[in-house]
C-alpha cells in the first residue's frame, strides 16, 4: 500500500511538472512569434542565411580588407630638341623647369643631345652631353631657395664653394654639382651619384596572395618562420637593363648627397634621345616596378637616331609610363604617314621586362596597359599649308586656323594615330624652326628655299588614362636651339592602399548573442558607426 501511495505521489508530481513545461513552452512560443527573426534563429541558421551574414561572429577576429584612397600629385613634363648642342655653364634651367611651382615628379625628355651624325648613330654613343644635362637638372631642382634665380654669382658659387645644395660635408668630393664643365663628365658616375640608394627601391611590392589557401592558413603562414617566406624576396626574371638606367649597388648606409630634395629615379640615352625621371625624396619608398625599353625607328627602321625611350614604374598602386620620342622628319606630303607608322611600331614593339611570377603583380608590359601614360617629344608633325600661307596666318595671330591644319590634330581626328590619347589646347606660337640665337623663324632672314622651314608645332605632350588633369601647357623662350622647349604640369591621381591596421569590420558589436532557453526575452543587438 505504501509503495502504491508513493507511486501516486510521483505520478502527481510528474503531471504537475509536465503541465508547467507545456505552459512555459506555450509562453516562449508566444513571445518568439512576436520577436524579430534575427533574435530567435539559431546560430547555425544565421550562418546559412545570406541576408544576415554579418552576424557571423567568427569574422570579427580578422582585420578589414585593405582599402584604397586617392591622392593627387603634381607631375611636370618637358620636351626639348636641343639641335645637337652641348650645354655650357651659362645655361640656367630653373625657368625651364618652373622650379618655383615645385612638382612631385619631373620628367625631362630631350632630342638631339648629340648631332645625329653617322659616328654617333653607327659607332660610339657620346655620353658627355647627357651627363651635363643631368648636372644642370639636378642643380636647378636642388638649388637652395635663398639663391636668386637670376644670380650669376650665386650660380657660379654653387659649383665652386663647399656648401652647395648637393655637396656638403664628407659627400662634397663625390657630389655631382662640384663637376667642372671643363672636365670630361662621366654619365655612369654622375647617374650613380644622383640616384637614390638602391635599397630604398622595391622591385615588386605587390602582395603574394594564394587564393587556394584559407584566410586562417595565410595568417598562420604570415607569422611562421620568416626565413621560409619568399613572398618579399621575389627576384625578377629576364631583368636586364642599360647601365645608365637602374640603381647601381650603393651601400645602404650611404647618405644622400647634401640631402637632395629630388633624386634621379631613372635615366636612359639612345643616340640623341635622353629621358630622365626625378622624384621628390619622400616619394621614393613608394616607387616600384621600375623598368625600361627603347625602340629604334631611324636608319633602316631600326637605328636609334629616331624612335623612343620608355620608362615604366608604379607609384603606390598606380602604374605610369613615360615615353620620349623623336619621330620621322620631313614636311613633304605623305611624311605624316611615316610618323603615324613610327607611333604604331613604338606601341607594338615596346615591351617591358616581366618582373615576377606573382600573378597579383600589377606591372604592365605594354605602353597602353598602364594606368597613366604621358608621351612627350619632337613628334615632327607639321602644318599642312605652304610657307607663305602659314606666314600670313602667323602675322595675323590666327592660330586657330593654323591648328585646324596641324597634321597631328588632323591625324588624331581621323583616328589614324594616338587613339585614346588627349592633348591640351595650344595657346602658344609654333615651336619650330627658329634661326640660331634668334626669335625669327628660319626663312625670314634668307631667300633660300632649301633652308626655309614652315613654322610648326613639332614639340608636343599628350596623355592617356583616367585621373589626369592638365593644369598648364606652355612653351619656353630660350634661344639655345632652333626648337623652343614645351612644358606641361598635370594633376595626377594615384591609388594609395591603406592596410587598416588594428581596425575591424564595421557594423556589429563583438558581444556574443545567445538565446537561453529558460529566459525567452528578446535581446537587444548593438550597432556602432
Swiss-Prot record:
Please name the top-level EC class of this enzyme: hydrolase
Q: What happens when the gene is disrupted?
A: Affected root hair morphogenesis.
Name the InterPro entries for this protein: Endo/exonu/phosph_ase_sf, IP5P_plant, IPPc
What are the entry keywords? Hydrolase
Note the SUPFAM superfamilies from the entry.
DNase I-like
Region described as Catalytic 1: 371-386
Return one Gene Ontology term, BP aspect.
root epidermal cell differentiation
**UniProt-listed Pfam families:** Exo_endo_phos2
User: Which Enzyme Commission number(s) are listed?
Assistant: 3.1.3.-
Q: Does the keyword Protein biosynthesis apply?
A: no
Positions of the UniProt region annotated as Catalytic 2: 451-466
UniProt KW Hydrolase keyword: yes
- Gene3D superfamilies to which the protein is assigned, alphabetical: Endonuclease/exonuclease/phosphatase
GO function terms (MF aspect)? inositol-polyphosphate 5-phosphatase activity
Family note: Belongs to the inositol polyphosphate 5-phosphatase family.
Q: What role does this protein play?
A: May be involved in the regulation of root hairs development. Required for restricting both the size of the root-hair initiation site and the width of the root hairs during the transition to tip growth, but is not required for normal subsequent tip growth.
| The protein's name | Type I inositol polyphosphate 5-phosphatase 5
Amino acid at each position: 500500500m505504501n509503495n502504491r501511495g508513493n507511486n501516486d505521489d510521483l505520478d502527481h508530481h510528474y503531471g504537475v511538472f509536465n503541465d508547467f513545461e507545456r505552459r512555459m513552452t506555450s509562453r516562449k512560443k508566444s513571445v518568439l512569434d512576436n520577436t524579430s527573426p534575427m533574435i530567435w534563429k539559431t546560430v547555425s541558421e544565421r550562418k546559412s542565411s545570406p541576408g544576415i551574414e554579418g552576424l557571423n561572429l567568427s569574422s570579427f577576429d580578422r582585420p578589414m580588407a585593405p582599402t584604397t584612397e586617392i591622392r593627387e600629385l603634381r607631375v611636370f613634363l618637358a620636351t626639348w630638341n636641343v639641335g645637337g648642342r652641348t650645354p655650357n655653364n651659362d645655361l640656367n634651367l630653373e625657368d625651364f623647369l618652373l622650379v618655383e611651382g615645385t612638382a612631385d615628379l619631373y620628367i625631362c625628355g630631350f632630342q638631339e643631345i648629340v648631332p645625329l651624325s653617322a659616328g654617333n648613330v653607327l659607332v660610339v654613343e657620346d655620353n658627355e652631353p647627357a651627363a651635363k644635362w643631368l648636372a644642370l637638372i639636378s642643380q636647378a631642382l636642388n638649388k637652395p631657395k635663398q639663391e636668386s634665380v637670376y644670380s650669376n654669382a650665386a650660380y657660379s658659387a654653387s659649383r665652386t664653394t663647399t656648401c652647395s645644395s648637393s655637396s656638403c660635408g664628407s659627400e662634397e668630393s663625390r657630389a655631382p654639382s662640384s663637376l667642372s664643365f671643363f672636365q670630361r663628365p662621366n654619365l655612369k658616375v654622375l647617374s650613380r651619384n644622383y640616384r637614390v640608394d638602391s635599397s630604398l627601391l622595391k622591385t615588386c611590392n605587390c602582395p603574394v596572395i594564394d587564393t587556394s589557401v584559407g584566410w586562417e592558413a595565410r595568417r598562420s603562414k604570415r607569422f611562421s618562420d620568416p626565413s621560409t617566406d619568399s613572398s618579399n624576396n621575389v627576384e625578377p626574371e629576364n631583368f636586364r637593363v642599360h647601365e645608365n638606367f637602374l640603381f647601381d649597388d650603393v651601400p645602404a648606409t650611404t647618405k644622400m648627397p647634401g640631402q637632395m630634395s629630388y633624386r634621379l629615379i631613372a635615366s636612359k640615352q639612345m643616340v640623341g634621345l635622353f629621358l630622365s625621371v626625378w622624384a621628390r625624396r619622400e616619394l621614393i619608398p613608394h616607387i616600384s616596378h621600375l623598368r625600361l625599353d627603347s625602340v629604334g625607328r631611324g636608319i633602316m627602321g631600326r637605328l636609334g637616331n629616331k624612335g623612343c625611350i620608355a620608362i615604366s614604374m608604379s607609384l603606390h598602386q598606380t602604374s605610369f609610363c613615360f615615353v620620349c620620342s623623336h619621330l620621322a622628319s620631313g614636311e613633304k606630303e605623305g611624311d605624316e604617314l611615316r610618323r603615324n607608322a613610327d607611333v604604331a611600331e613604338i606601341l607594338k614593339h615596346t615591351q617591358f621586362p616581366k618582373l615576377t611570377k606573382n600573378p597579383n603583380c600589377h606591372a604592365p608590359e605594354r605602353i597602353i596597359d598602364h594606368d597613366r601614360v604621358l608621351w612627350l617629344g619632337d613628334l615632327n608633325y607639321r602644318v599642312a599649308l605652304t610657307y607663305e600661307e602659314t606666314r600670313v596666318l602667323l602675322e595675323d595671330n590666327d592660330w586657330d586656323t593654323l591648328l585646324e591644319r596641324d597634321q597631328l590634330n588632323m591625324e588624331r581626328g581621323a583616328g589614324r594615330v594616338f587613339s585614346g590619347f588627349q592633348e591640351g589646347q595650344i595657346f602658344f606660337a609654333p615651336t619650330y624652326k627658329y634661326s640660331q640665337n634668334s626669335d625669327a623663324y628660319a626663312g625670314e632672314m634668307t631667300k633660300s628655299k632649301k633652308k626655309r622651314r614652315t613654322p610648326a608645332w613639332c614639340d608636343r605632350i599628350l596623355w592617356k588614362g583616367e585621373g589626369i588633369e592638365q593644369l598648364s601647357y606652355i612653351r619656353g623662350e630660350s634661344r639655345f636651339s632652333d626648337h623652343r622647349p614645351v612644358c606641361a604640369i598635370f594633376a595626377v591621381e594615384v591609388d594609395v592602399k591603406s592596410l587598416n591596421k588594428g581596425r575591424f569590420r564595421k557594423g556589429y558589436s563583438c558581444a556574443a548573442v545567445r538565446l537561453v532557453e529558460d529566459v525567452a526575452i528578446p535581446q537587444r543587438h548593438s550597432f556602432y558607426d
